[in-house]
Amino acid sequence: MTYVFPETIAAQATPSGRGGIGVVRVSGEKTKAIAQKILGCVPKPRYATFVKFRDSGSVIDEGIALYFPKPNSFTGEDVLELHGHGGPVVMDRLLNTVLKAGARQARPGEFSERAFLNNKIDLAQAEAVADLINASSEQAARSAMRSLQGEFSKRIHQLVDALIQLRMYIEASIDFPEEEIDFLADERIKETLENLTHQVQEIEKTAKQGALLREGITVVIAGEPNVGKSSLLNLLSGQETAIVTDIAGTTRDIIRESIHIDGLPIHVVDTAGLRLTEDVVEKEGVRRTQKAVQQADLLLLMIDASKPTEDFKKIIAQWFSENDNKIPTLIVENKIDLIGEAPRKENKEYPHIKLSVKTRAGVELLKNHLKNTAGFEATHENNFIARRRHCDAIARASAFLKNANNHLLNQKAGELVAEDLKLAQNALSEITGEFTSDDLLGKIFSEFCIGK
């Protein structure tokens, strides 16, 4: 069944700016009437038709029109796409003509929202549309495409169906107590519940990988002036992002650069050198450094390996006495080329990596540590893209299933087991949108671009 929305919507579906082609998309009950006004006809469904786009008889542009009648369209409504020349003036005139003919400007994500409400895609697939557009690596794009094609949703639906079947079986033992069968003592219930718990734990691991592909981790490089922080940023990013000189205090502000290591997005933050200073600008840089550190997933505390050992022990002790030591920290001992040491990793109170940014010795050790800290598996080919809300929902489902196991094995409490299964089912159904609040839907679709 197609949901009938009272308003027809329109938006430019291609990015703003100059381009060879620009597309205006229309969806809703007035689509055919709008086509008749602007094109003088309703194009043959699913055929590219070359036409002139007119406003009150005056030709605005000429190009290709594509018409998709309901319900076999992206939104499930009548959809019209007008492909014209991609100049901003032309696109503005064409969109304004469509709006004047009876449509209104679409909100961000409103086309995808209508597709979801008309059961053309589920919520996880709708989110995958945005994730595919925003993918920052080839691996993220492939994973988003798998989600868009429904692989993630299929696994969630299979789990939900299995939970429903098990819950029905357990509820039967509650509703028909006169039957002389102890359903809860049935070994198959125990095995099924254990199997479902394991499956949810496995999909939780995969979802975490998908969330890492989408969001990555934030790594902050901090330390005293002139220890090689900016040089490390330049080395990791592969370009001269930060100015590097022998003068202490060159970096006075936060410098951010996004890189990829085997598909893992890493947001690297280079910071001002930490030292006592009377310079007002440098003081502000130090303050921003301390703020950036609090938002880090991993801190790289850089020190100069060529200095006496007691000096950098004092630096490390002072740092952790003044800052939150709950943030995962790696001590990076740079400039080992000056003292003739080989690169290596040491696991002390805090892990240490000895390297030389100048010679690149030990840099692979650092990259591997970044991936391991994030829990990233670069060779995981069956990843789907995931969001934090997906991970949260799966984690809640996993917790409910653990409760169900406890209630089954230790208390033989059928009612509690059934309730745990229902809660796990609802948590998983939030992912595909079958059990979702309107507030969450509004938040999700508001993050889309206009025209999608």
Swiss-Prot record:
GO molecular function ontology, one term from the record: GTPase activity
Function: Exhibits a very high intrinsic GTPase hydrolysis rate. Involved in the addition of a carboxymethylaminomethyl (cmnm) group at the wobble position (U34) of certain tRNAs, forming tRNA-cmnm(5)s(2)U34.
Keyword terms: Cytoplasm, GTP-binding, Hydrolase, Magnesium, Metal-binding, Nucleotide-binding, Potassium, tRNA processing
Full protein name: tRNA modification GTPase MnmE
Native source species: Coxiella burnetii (strain RSA 493 / Nine Mile phase I)
Pfam families recorded: MMR_HSR1, MnmE_helical, TrmE_N
Organism ancestry: Bacteria, Pseudomonadati, Pseudomonadota, Gammaproteobacteria, Legionellales
Top-level EC class as recorded in UniProt: hydrolase
Binding site for GTP: 226-231, 245-251, 270-273
UniProt-annotated binding residues for K(+): 226, 245, 247, 250
Chief location category: cytoplasm
Record gene name: mnmE
